[in-house]
């Protein structure tokens, strides 16, 4: 049975998530394809719905906006949802580094020119996208009404670095020229990434270019900057280091994930004094995929509350 449970400050209904098993075998080659968009081109995004409540979704590392298509549709007719591809992901342009302040400012400019042109919007971010969302809310509070942070905290996240060293390393070493189909690529990846859902998540980024497979995200650059991806800027706003985001914040955590820990609570409450922390049972780091009904219910309830 799925339960959606608030947990009081100082408690944690979490246990360590089992990472995909690592293989001793090695792969061989790097195949990536640069985004066709200039590095300063607009971010790619998709809108779903035409409701009065506006919310933007930011995905995690190796994700893309369309990962949230299901939840966006389930929110209902009251919502307009924008699914944004972060830089170096999906159809958005590539860059040469990872800097959360720069990414947040770029997403803010995208929102200011579109979804948030007429006023603040709600913002939801998962994992890496959750860090971007927190930084954006602190740097551009005029753009954000309510904030939802999914299974990440405003601190260093060693879990992300450890897990994605293996996953991105596997992607980069695959000889994509050797595969004639996605099934063949999946079989090769299965020797190193045993979880079929994780493989599906990674292989969504495989594209045919000039008759050959290539990775659409900027995998090599992201791999080189995993330490920065796992970090969190401090201060977020150098010119105003004491700034907080004093709007309602929903902090979702998967009960079977270890990305949110008790020691993260003081910093989260310091930056976001109106935060409410909630855990979702039987859910890991990708809780929107593990428990979609509970996820959508939580998001809708939070965004429609008076």
Language model: regions and residue ranges:
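Serine-hydrolase catalytic-loop signature spanning alpha/beta hydrolases and amidase-signature enzymes
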Residues: 62-70
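Conserved serine/cysteine hydrolase catalytic core
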Residues: 211-271, 276-279
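Active-site loop/oxyanion-hole signature of alpha/beta-hydrolase fold enzymes
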Residues: 39-44, 73, 79-125, 132, ...
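Short beta-strand-to-loop junctions in surface cap/lid or active-site-entrance loops
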Residues: 42-53
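Flexible "cap/lid" loop of the alpha/beta hydrolase fold
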Residues: 135-138, 144-182
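Active-site glycine-rich loops that stabilize anionic/oxyanionic intermediates
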Residues: 52, 60-63, 127
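Conserved alpha/beta-hydrolase catalytic His-Asp/Glu region
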Residues: 177-233
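Catalytic histidine-centered segment of alpha/beta-hydrolase-like enzymes
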Residues: 283-296
